Amino acid sequence: MTKLPNKAKVVIIGGGIHGLSTAWKLSETYKNPGDIVVLEKKDTAAGASGIACGVIRNNYFQPAMRELMAHSVSVWESDPKAFKYNPVGYLQISPEVMHEDVASIYEQQKAIGYESVFIEGEKDCTNYMKGIFDDWQAQGITSVLHEKKGGYAFNKDSIKALESKSTSNGVQVMKGVKVTGFKKGSNSQAVTGVETDKGIIECEQV
């Protein structure tokens, strides 16, 4: 492993999708090599990011999440080859008990300009699904929300792509480094460094 640097402008803890996507975007502002350091106790994609299902969708009840996901889908679309992203869309196929909630999701998708189709009624839903899967047989379906964007990605490959994009911009990704605590200013609670099992790295932001 490369020796832990003594200091950095930004230290990011964790080499999953949150840590590496943050590093990648911050590297557009912090352009000097070594400005940003990512500390990962094992390997990139070793945690939840490496075992997630990989579905990319905008199917959430919270309005703020829908706007965030609409933005995130555009990031996946920016480099599908590198991210191993497959833009096949997303289907929510529901019984009557979910009709009202799914209709609400559709209306809010429409309000932010996120392309989707909402099919209502058992007969129309069956016909719509048979147009996609000619052997469709499910009964009791009264609504179908078809998001035309979204799809799925191979998550470990996606994380490695984020790592590559980050390091290409000068980010240092330090693996096998366990964070043990934080160094704080003498007269404040402001963090001035990150303590690890490999030493202390001074920083401006964590």
What does each model-identified segment do?
Residues K3-H18, V37:
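Beta1/beta-strand and adjacent pyrophosphate-binding region of the FAD-binding site
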Residues L20-W24, K160:
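Short, hydrophobic alpha-helix immediately C-terminal to the catalytic nucleophile
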Residues S27-S49:
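Glycine-rich FAD pyrophosphate-binding loop
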Residues G34-I36, S116-V117, V206:
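Hydrophobic anchor at the start of a short beta-strand
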Residues L145-Q205:
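Helical element adjacent to the flavin cofactor pocket in flavoenzyme catalytic cores
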